[in-house]
Amino acid sequence: MNPNQKIITIGSICMVIGIVSLMLQIGNIISIWVSHSIQTGNQHQAEPIGNTNFLTEKAVASVTLAGNSSLCPISGWAVHSKDNGIRIGSKGDVFVIREPFISCSHLECRTFFLTQGALLNDKHSNGTVKDRSPHRTLMSCPVGEAPSPYNSRFESVAWSASACHDGTSWLTIGISGPDNGAVAVLKYNGIITDTIKSWRNNILRTQESECACVNGSCFTVMTDGPSNGQASYKIFKMEKGKVVKSVELDAPNYHYEECSCYPDAGEITCVCRDNWHGSNRPWVSFNQNLEYQIGYICSGVFGDNPRPNDGTGSCGPVSPNGAYGVKGFSFKYGNGVWIGRTKSTNSRSGFEMIWDPNGWTGTDSSFSVKQDIVAITDWSGYSGSFVQHPELTGLDCIRPCFWVELIRGRPKESTIWTSGSSISFCGVNSDTVGWSWPDGAELPFTIDK
C-alpha cells in the first residue's frame, strides 16, 4: 500500500468513527429528550392527582368528633405505648417532666407534658421537685416517644394544663402565674383565643389530662381554693377556644381536683381526686348544657392513694386515710366500673386495673377482674383517662384508654431531680395479659453523684 492509499484509508476510518460518534450523540440527545418529555408529561399528569390528594386531605382533616357513641365493651387492657424517657435520658437529651397525659385527634395521638425548662442529667434539673415555677411549659410529642427538644412542640406556658382536639384543631389550656392570681390561657390552633382568671385567688388548677369534646364543643373542669378543704369548682364549655358557658358546682363537702374526663353517649363523665377527706373518688357528669350530677364512686374497692384496705364503700367520701391523694381515673359501665389504682395503699407504687361489676352504685368490695400493670415494687404516680374516637379507630364506639405516670427521682430517690416516663393502655374485647411495665431506669445519674 503506497503512502497515498494509507492516508486515504486512515482518513476513511476516522470519518467512519466520527460519523458513528455523531450518530451516538444524536441518539443520546433524542433519548434524553424523549425521557424528559415522558417525565414532564407524567409530572403534568400527576399535578392534578397531587392537588386532589392535598385537597382531599384538607377536607378529611377537618371533622367533628361527635362523641355521641357509647364506650366500647371491653374485657381487658392492651398495652398501647411506653416512652422509656428516663432510661433514654441518662444519655440522650430528654426533658425533665411531670404530669404527662395523652390525647388523640382523629388522625394521631400525642403525649402532652409539663416540662421544667431543663434536661435530664443536667445542672438545671436540680430542684425540679417543685410543682409551680415560671419555667414550666406545656409541650407535646408523638405518643410513645421520649420527650426531647428534637421531637416536641411548644404548646403553652403552664404549671397546670389540659388539651384536646375537636376534630378541627387542638385546644390547649395552660395555667401560669402567681398562686394568688394565676390565669388560664386558652389557645386554639396555637393562637390565644381566651383567658380565665383565678376567681378565688388560691392556685387555679385544672385536669392534668385531656379535656373532652362533643359535637364541636370541648369541656374542662377547674378548681380554685384550698387543697385540704372546701374549694370552688367550675365546668367550662368552649367552642373554637372561646368560653361560651360555665357553671360553678353546688357541691358542699365535695372536693374535686385533677379530673379525668371522657365523653360517653353525648355526655361527659369526670372522675377526680379528693385531696381533702375522701379515699374514694368523686365524680361529676354533665350534658352539653352543663346540667350536672355529682357523687362518689360507691365501691368498697377504693381508688385513691393513700387509702384504707378494701372494705365497705360509700356513695359519699370515705374518710379513713382520706386526706391527700393522687390523680386517677375510672370508667363507668352502667352500674359497673373499671377502677385504676396504685397497688400500694400508702405510696405511689404499683398499678392495677379492677373491674367491679356493681361498683358504681354498690358498696361491697367484690370484683371479678384484676389486671396487673406495674408491680408494687416499682414506682407509679398520676394516672388518667383518654379516649380514641370512632373517627380515629373506625369502630362504632368510643375506645377507653388510660396512661400511667412512672415518677422517678425526688422525693423517694437520691437524685437532684424529679421526672417521669409513661405507659398507656387501651380497652379491648379480646385477649390481654397482666404483667409489670416499670420505668426501668437505673439511678442515680452522673449529675447526682
Curated annotation (Swiss-Prot):
Job of this protein: Catalyzes the removal of terminal sialic acid residues from viral and cellular glycoconjugates. Cleaves off the terminal sialic acids on the glycosylated HA during virus budding to facilitate virus release. Additionally helps virus spread through the circulation by further removing sialic acids from the cell surface. These cleavages prevent self-aggregation and ensure the efficient spread of the progeny virus from cell to cell. Otherwise, infection would be limited to one round of replication.
What is catalysed by this protein? Hydrolysis of alpha-(2->3)-, alpha-(2->6)-, alpha-(2->8)- glycosidic linkages of terminal sialic acid residues in oligosaccharides, glycoproteins, glycolipids, colominic acid and synthetic substrates
Q: Where are the transmembrane segments?
A: 7-27
Q: Which organism is it from?
A: Influenza A virus (strain A/Silky Chicken/Hong Kong/SF189/2001 H5N1 genotype A)
- Which sequence ranges are listed under topological domain Virion surface? 28-449
**Active site residues per record:** 131 (proton donor/acceptor), 382 (nucleophile)
Activity regulation, in the record's words, is: Inhibited by the neuraminidase inhibitors zanamivir (Relenza) and oseltamivir (Tamiflu). These drugs interfere with the release of progeny virus from infected cells and are effective against all influenza strains. Resistance to neuraminidase inhibitors is quite rare.
What note about domains is in the entry? Intact N-terminus is essential for virion morphogenesis. Possesses two apical sorting signals, one in the ectodomain, which is likely to be a glycan, and the other in the transmembrane domain. The transmembrane domain also plays a role in lipid raft association.
Per UniProt, where does substrate bind? 98, 132, 257-258, 273, 348
Q: Where in the cell is it found?
A: Virion membrane; Host apical cell membrane
All ranges on the Intravirion side of the membrane? 1-6
Q: Which InterPro entries match?
A: Glyco_hydro_34 (IPR001860), Sialidase_Influenza_A/B (IPR033654), Sialidase_sf (IPR036278)
Is Translocase there in the keyword field?
Answer: no
Q: Which residues are glycosylated?
A: 68, 126, 215
Tell me what this protein is called: Neuraminidase
What this protein needs as a cofactor is: Ca(2+)
Q: EC?
A: 3.2.1.18
What gene does the UniProt entry assign to this protein? NA
> What are the binding positions for Ca(2+) in this chain?
274, 278, 304
By sequence similarity, the record places it as follows: Belongs to the glycosyl hydrolase 34 family.
